[in-house]
């Protein structure tokens, strides 16, 4: 099996929660609501949703933001949840004692949750820089536009 090398990302950070005792279906129901949203908006949504799976996901999103601000110095206002995935973990099997010496099996599903946050401020700066490289008069065009309109309309010049 050939493994791909992961590129080092300078604009994203992640938090990984493993063996969270919750069904993957129930966790995905919550994760689908916050995928692609900003960090602050996701926290508000997670606080107000009535599901039991919201609290572990809330802690993971908060931890990923703490990683972003501490390790890479990102501002929390620019963070966006770029990737959020839920994978199935091990199933913990227990025996519940019942009447007359019998026992019933109990299955506790677990899941692994990955939250990836991305800093959007770098993308905006990069896009502006590319526009500047493609068109050197990019910023000056915005400034000189009103003057050009006044001259082209014939307001100031009295041409014959």
Swiss-Prot record:
CDD domains: Ribosomal_L22. Keywords: Chloroplast, Plastid, Ribonucleoprotein, Ribosomal protein, RNA-binding, rRNA-binding. It comes from the Eukaryota. It is found in: Plastid, Chloroplast. One of its GO terms (biological process) is translation. GO terms for cellular component: chloroplast; large ribosomal subunit. GO terms for molecular function: rRNA binding; structural constituent of ribosome. This protein binds specifically to 23S rRNA. The globular domain of the protein is located near the polypeptide exit tunnel on the outside of the subunit, while an extended beta-hairpin is found that lines the wall of the exit tunnel in the center of the 70S ribosome. Part of the 50S ribosomal subunit. Belongs to the universal ribosomal protein uL22 family. This is Large ribosomal subunit protein uL22c. The gene is rpl22.
């Amino acid at each position: 099996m050939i493994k791909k090398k992961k590129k080092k990302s300078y604009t994203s950070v992640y938090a990984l929660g493993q063996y969270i005792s919750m069904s993957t279906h129930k966790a995905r129901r919550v994760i689908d609501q916050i995928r692609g949203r900003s960090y602050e908006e996701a926290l508000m949504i997670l606080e107000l949703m009535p599901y039991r799976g919201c609290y572990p996901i809330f802690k993971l999103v908060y931890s990923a933001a703490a990683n972003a601000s501490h390790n890479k110095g990102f501002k929390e206002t620019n963070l966006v949840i770029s990737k959020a995935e839920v994978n199935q973990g091990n199933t913990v099997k227990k025996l519940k004692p019942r009447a007359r010496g019998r026992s019933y099996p109990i299955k506790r599903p677990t899941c692994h949750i990955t939250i990836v946050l991305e800093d959007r401020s770098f993308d905006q700066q990069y896009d502006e820089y590319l526009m500047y490289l493609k068109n050197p008069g990019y910023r000056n065009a915005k400034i000189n536009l009103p003057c050009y309109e006044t001259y082209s309309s014939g307001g100031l010049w009295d041409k014959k």
